[in-house]
């Protein structure tokens, strides 16, 4: 399904991406959903909560993408035991999570790192 969406020219248009106030980011960015790396391999940059489609074509494209990802037979669903964590490279994995269930006996540390990093 992603192959078909990757070939759709709408996926290579610039999309506007915003953030809710809770993220403390007061600017928007523009980039396509699909592009290619230096070797021509497909890449995806997508977060389902923040797109601001600029027209019906973009809105329909995002809906098809969301439906395709949700219906995918390739997704992995796992439960993390209390005290476990996952570190994921956002440039390699698409990921999501359900809301945290509050546990008064645990503390949660959220670390956001933004910026450019050394690339070998």
Label each residue range with its predicted role.
Residues 1-82, 87-120:
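Active-site environment of non-heme Fe oxygenases that use a 2-His-1-carboxylate facial triad
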């Amino acid at each position: 399904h992603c192959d078909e969406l990757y070939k759709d020219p709408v996926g290579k248009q610039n999309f506007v991406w915003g953030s809710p106030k809770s993220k403390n980011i007061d600017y928007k960015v523009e980039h396509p959903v699909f592009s290619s790396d230096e070797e021509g391999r497909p890449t995806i940059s997508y977060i389902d909560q923040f797109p601001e489609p600029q027209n019906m074509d973009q809105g329909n494209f995002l809906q098809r993408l969301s439906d395709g990802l949700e219906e995918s037979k390739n997704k992995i669903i796992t439960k993390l035991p209390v005290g476990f964590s996952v570190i994921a490279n956002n440039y390699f994995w698409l990921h999501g999570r359900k809301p945290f269930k509050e546990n008064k006996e645990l503390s949660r540390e959220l670390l956001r790192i933004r910026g450019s990093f050394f690339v070998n």
